[in-house]
UniProtKB/Swiss-Prot annotation:
Pfam families named among the record's database cross-references: SEC-C, YchJ_M-like
Gene3D superfamilies: 3.10.450.50
Matches recorded under HAMAP family: UPF0225 (MF_00612)
Protein name per its UniProtKB record: UPF0225 protein YPO2172/y2149/YP_1971
Domain of life: Bacteria
Length: 154
């Protein structure tokens, strides 16, 4: 890959998320791990996704479900909104919006999540996330410019 990184940075893939996915570098911050996980979804790299889920999640059990999801989803972009510390130094949160098209719906949809990450030794892991609520009159996250109720919120 010699193109720009799918995570939305202005860097080449090999200078951005590639080294994390290849395992030659460790993500020093949760936002970096978030970006590399997004790239893994784009690349359909189930092994990296499973390796970066917190061990308590037992993500290996979801392998087939994750692979099945790859066949239905086309990713269109990632916006990292904020990275915030948690209650202790080994916890942090990353809020993001990921845009995608699902095979069942030709329209671009957006997923807005505040993901929680935990650190074990020097490695960060995704553990869970919450989806902030969006009002019906708020602008839709998919980027259409329409109100949520007239777009993805139908």
């Amino acid at each position: 890959m010699s193109e720009l990184c799918p995570c939305g940075s202005i860097l080449n893939y090999h200078e951005c998320c590639g080294p994390y996915i290849l395992g030659t570098q460790v993500a020093a911050k949760p936002a970096i791990l978030m970006r590399s996980r997004y790239c893994a979804y784009v690349e359909k790299n189930v092994d990296y996704l499973i390796a970066t889920w917190h061990p308590d999640c037992h993500a290996q059990e979801w392998r087939e479900s994750i692979i099945q999801g790859f066949t239905k989803t086309v990713w269109h972009g990632l916006t990292v909104i904020a990275e915030t510390p948690g209650r202790h130094p080994d916890e942090a949160f990353v809020e993001f919006i990921a845009r995608f098209t699902d095979a069942d719906n030709a329209q671009i949809t957006a997923m807005h999540e505040r993901s929680r990450f935990l650190r074990i030794k020097e490695h960060w892991y995704y553990i869970d996330g919450i989806r902030p609520s969006l009002g019906r009159n708020d602008t839709c996250l998919c980027g259409s410019g329409k109100k949520h109720k007239k777009c993805c919120g139908r």
